[in-house]
Amino acid sequence: MTVSTGIWILIVVIGVLVGLTGGFFGARHYMQNYLKQNPPISEEMLRSMMMQMGQRPSEKKLHQMLNSMKAASKNDNK
């Protein structure tokens, strides 16, 4: 039972396309669930955290904290 080269190429191309499509949607689903469970911190969340700690949040202090958190996350990813 011999299968021609053209059919093998077609099977491989279809397999690659199915794998890429499945991988894309799998990664997309994973990231959506991850962001739902671990939302990125926003300025409002930071403001409410500072108020709960008894601090009066100024805009300058908020931006300093946001920038330091962004810098720390960049260093963690390296």
UniProtKB/Swiss-Prot annotation:
Pfam families in the record: UPF0154 (PF03672)
Presence of the UniProt keyword Zinc in the record: no
Bilayer topology: Single-pass membrane protein
Source taxon at top rank: Bacteria
Keywords: Membrane, Transmembrane, Transmembrane helix
Record localization: Membrane
Keyword Transmembrane helix applies: yes
Transmembrane segments: 5-27
A GO CC term assigned to this protein in UniProt: plasma membrane
InterPro entries to which the protein is assigned, alphabetical: UPF0154
Main location group: membrane
Family named by the database record: Belongs to the UPF0154 family.
Protein name: UPF0154 protein lp_2061
Organism: Lactiplantibacillus plantarum (strain ATCC BAA-793 / NCIMB 8826 / WCFS1)
